[in-house]
A protein has these predicted regions:
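Catalytic-loop of the protein kinase fold
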Residues: 2-15
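Conserved activation segment of eukaryotic-like protein kinases, specifically the C-terminal portion
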Residues: 37-51
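Activation segment
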Residues: 54-59
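Conserved catalytic-loop aspartate of Hanks-type protein kinases
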Residues: 62
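Conserved C-terminal C-lobe helix
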Residues: 104-117
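A conserved short helix/loop substructure at the end of the activation segment
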Residues: 117-129
Length: 218
């Protein structure tokens, strides 16, 4: 469809049942050809580095957000729940900061999640690739893959036996999980300078000129 959601986070997802969820709040949804880098809205922990650094939205930015939603679904902890959601966090994300993974996650899901977090947009999977990768592990997968998946899930469950689920009461008072305008995000501006090309030509009588200057100096 060539659209970007531009505000994808767990607060914009509703569940009908265990197997069916819907993405909501398409108020900021735009075609991929439309960007408003001077008017950036979002929830900082779910926003991609390129969006926070220069107000740039792409389909890959939504994939980054999907990776953060995966973290919350798999661990119960929203990203960066224990620190202020301010310009310092935005700067950290732009410098490569990643959220803490609070518990053991089945390896096949962890690998997909961390690919979505890749700092470089072009290195993140597309939505089509995500569908294909996740589809390999559904209930219709072959016996060998199902065995690997079950083993990874069992290992994670065993490791998480005493895991403490997320308690909203431990959330930092300045951790904000609602979409808001972020005035500190500005489009990247490149300074340009007028340049002039100068042509330098060595005259044929350069030796005579040098000798004449030497005589005058003496």
């Amino acid at each position: 469809m060539g659209l970007m959601h531009k505000d994808f986070h767990s607060g914009n997802i509703i569940n009908q049942n265990f197997a069916l969820s819907y993405i909501t709040d398409f108020g900021l949804c735009k075609p991929v050809t439309e960007n408003e880098p001077e008017n950036v809205y979002g929830v900082i922990p779910y926003m991609a580095p390129e969006t926070l650094s220069r107000g740039e939205y792409t389909k890959a930015s939504d994939i980054y957000s999907f990776g953060m939603v995966m973290l919350e679904v798999l661990t119960s902890y929203p990203p960066y729940y224990n620190i202020p959601h301010n310009e310092n966090l935005a700067m950290g994300i732009c410098e490569g900061l990643k959220p803490e993974i609070k518990c053991e996650i089945p390896q096949f899901l962890k690998e997909i999640m961390e690919k979505c977090w890749n700092f470089e947009p072009l290195n993140r999977p597309t939505a089509e690739e995500l569908g294909s990768q996740l589809g390999k592990y559904d209930y219709r997968c072959n016996n060998e893959i199902r065995k690997q998946v079950n083993n990874q899930i069992n290992v994670a469950n065993k490791s998480n036996k005493n895991f403490i689920q997320y308690d909203p009461n431990v959330k930092h008072s300045e951790a904000i999980y609602t979409s808001r305008h972020l005035p500190f995000v500005k489009s990247k501006k490149f300074e340009t300078h007028d340049t002039k090309q100068c042509n330098f030509v060595i005259p044929d009588d350069i030796n005579d000129i040098i000798e004449e200057n030497e005589i005058q100096e003496n």
